[in-house]
From Swiss-Prot:
This is Uncharacterized protein K02A2.1. InterPro entries: AB_hydrolase_fold, Dienelactn_hydro, FrsA_esterase. One of its GO terms (molecular function) is hydrolase activity. The lineage of its organism: Eukaryota, Metazoa, Ecdysozoa, Nematoda, Chromadorea. It comes from Caenorhabditis elegans. SUPFAM superfamilies: alpha/beta-Hydrolases.
Amino acid sequence: MTSDRNGKLKPRLEAALNALKSVPCVDKQKLGAFGFCIGGLCSLDCARYRFDGIRAVISFHGTLTPIEGIPLELLDDNSIQVHHGDADKHVSKVTVDAFHEEMRARNSDFVFISHGKAMHSFTDPESAGIAPSGVGYDANAEKRSWKATLEFLKEAFA
């Protein structure tokens, strides 16, 4: 799915967003997206695709690679917050730097928080049982990232 983000992933993200918008009590112009790992990528892609109504996007230890083949349109109608584990071996420094460059090129309102000592999946207490190396829970990073997220959402939807 992530290898075909324009062909397979984008329509699924749009379908999920449209399902949310169909709920009567939802303000269709004040939507947010957040996710963990691949869900973090999906959240960032909601901003990159400039889906109508998305105002706040949060990624927790998400994949940061840009979408190939789409123009670098301005992202001036939403805010982005990224929580990254500084010891995350699944996302290289080159990829982190490329993400920063992409966000600057798009004139994005973004916050990038690098949690020291935190590895990939730092929010998941069960991650110690996951086979890949470089994955692990970090209570401090989990607590701090969630606290920052709540403040970010208050600001975005004030």
